[in-house]
Amino acid sequence: MASTAKKSSRSASGRVNRTVRGSPKATASVSRKVTTAATIRKIGDDWARHWNAGELDGVVAAYAEDAVYLPPHHEAVHGREAIRRYLKVPLGHSVSDLAFEVAYIKQQGPIAWDVGTYRMTIPQSDGTKKEDRGKYLSVWRRVGKKWLLAADAWSSDLPPSA
């Protein structure tokens, strides 16, 4: 049985490079998964940046043509254009300061899933602001060389307003 030794190093770009002696296939797999997680984190960060800037096109560009959006207290929204119409309303109400904290990202072939928490500020009709926090689950699908949201679900940790 061949011995495998692991070695990690950080490149100038900050990417962790792992080598597993005796297992080039394992090395390629680890490298691809690290790259996938970093790519998905960046897309998520860009999504939040576009959201906070009120840039609907940038938000919607992250979704696959046949994506499903699963917001709390609402029926499922199917398709990129339907998601665009649905998101136009809250985006127009200045929901802001949206930030995600990724708990983990896993990948299996052309599918990846991203689990974490979010927080955001929601302006109220009386001029006050309401803080919200909750969790999300996003399913990503690789289309060519791009990762796109195939399913996006979230729910607040706070009780619904009366």
Task: Identify the meaning behind each predicted range.
Residues I105-A112, R141-K146:
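A short, structured loop/turn motif at beta-sheet edges
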Residues S125-G127, P159-A162:
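A short, polar/proline- and glycine-enriched secondary-structure boundary/capping micro-motif
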